């Protein structure tokens, strides 16, 4: 009896689906409160005005309005939701 299995029989066979992360709403698009703006791991994009962050770093709109992306002095990417407009 062989001590090892045939070559690679049980180690292959995985091809996990992607996790659909990324920017879901782009700048100057209109959103409703609760809309997901960004799905991410860690804070690649930081929450700005009227944007909340979930425990998995998902950013979402807190109010109805228009999305605006910007950079801070420290070169951080920030997403905000501007009311009205």
Swiss-Prot record:
InterPro entries on file: Ribosomal_bL27 (IPR001684)
UniProt keyword annotation of Ribosomal protein present: yes
Record region (Disordered): 1-22
UniProt entry keywords in alphabetical sequence: Ribonucleoprotein, Ribosomal protein
Organism superkingdom: Bacteria
GO biological process: translation
Pfam families: Ribosomal_L27
A single GO cellular-component term on record: cytosolic large ribosomal subunit
SUPFAM superfamilies recorded: Ribosomal L27 protein-like
Molecular function as annotated in GO: structural constituent of ribosome
Keyword Ribosomal protein listed: yes
Similarity section: Belongs to the bacterial ribosomal protein bL27 family.
Name listed for the protein in its UniProt record: Large ribosomal subunit protein bL27
Source species: Anaeromyxobacter dehalogenans (strain 2CP-C)
Biological classification of the source: Bacteria, Pseudomonadati, Myxococcota, Myxococcia, Myxococcales
């Amino acid at each position: 009896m062989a001590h090892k299995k045939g070559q690679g029989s049980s180690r292959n066979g995985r091809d996990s689906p992607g996790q659909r992360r990324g920017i879901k709403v782009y700048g100057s698009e209109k959103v409703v409160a609760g809309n997901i703006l960004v799905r991410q791991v860690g804070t690649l994009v930081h929450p700005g005005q009227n944007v909340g962050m979930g425990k998995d770093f998902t950013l979402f709109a807190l109010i109805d309005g228009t999305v605006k992306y910007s950079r801070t002095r420290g070169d951080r990417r920030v997403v905000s939701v501007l009311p009205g407009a």
